[in-house]
Amino acid sequence: MFYSIVAIFVGAGLGALLRWFLSIGLNALLPEVPLGTLVSNLIGGYLIGIAVVAFATRAGLPPEWRLFVITGFMGGLTTFSTYSVEVMTHATQGEFGWALAVAALHLIGSFTLTGLGMWTARAWLAPA
């Protein structure tokens, strides 16, 4: 149990730091669509697609690795609450087009990149 807690704790901290760095570096580029949150969610979608397939095909890995990557790192990197606030901020300001655009970018982009990540992992991990 101790190693599971440490794996989640460290993974979440690293994921959250990456999200923060992305926000610092990208949010000012396009204030209407905070790119730090979007890029965090898109990267997270892609990486979790890879991780799910990789862990499914690598049964011998210790369970702490899955907890570190999926529960910890991806949980710290991706954010539904910040995305929700950004969409609702546009909506409450009457910017319904921007609200819809931000929502669509996150949802469609994340689903697309998760699928791409799964495809990538299957291609990498396929028997030669």
Swiss-Prot record:
Principal cellular location given in the protein's record: membrane
UniProt keyword list: Cell inner membrane, Cell membrane, Ion channel, Ion transport, Membrane, Metal-binding, Sodium, Transmembrane, Transmembrane helix, Transport
Intracellular or extracellular location(s): Cell inner membrane
Any Pfam family hit: CRCB
The keyword Metal-binding belongs to this UniProt entry's keyword annotation: yes
Keyword match Cell wall biogenesis/degradation: no
Chemical reaction(s) catalysed: fluoride(in) = fluoride(out)
Annotated positions binding Na(+): 75, 78
TM ranges: 5-25, 35-55, 67-87, 96-116
One GO cellular component, as annotated: plasma membrane
InterPro entries: FluC (IPR003691)
Recorded GO MF terms: fluoride channel activity; metal ion binding
Modes of activity regulation: Na(+) is not transported, but it plays an essential structural role and its presence is essential for fluoride channel function.
Annotated PANTHER family: FLUORIDE EXPORT PROTEIN 1-RELATED
Family: Belongs to the fluoride channel Fluc/FEX (TC 1.A.43) family.
Name of this chain's protein: Fluoride-specific ion channel FluC
Organism, as annotated: Burkholderia thailandensis (strain ATCC 700388 / DSM 13276 / CCUG 48851 / CIP 106301 / E264)
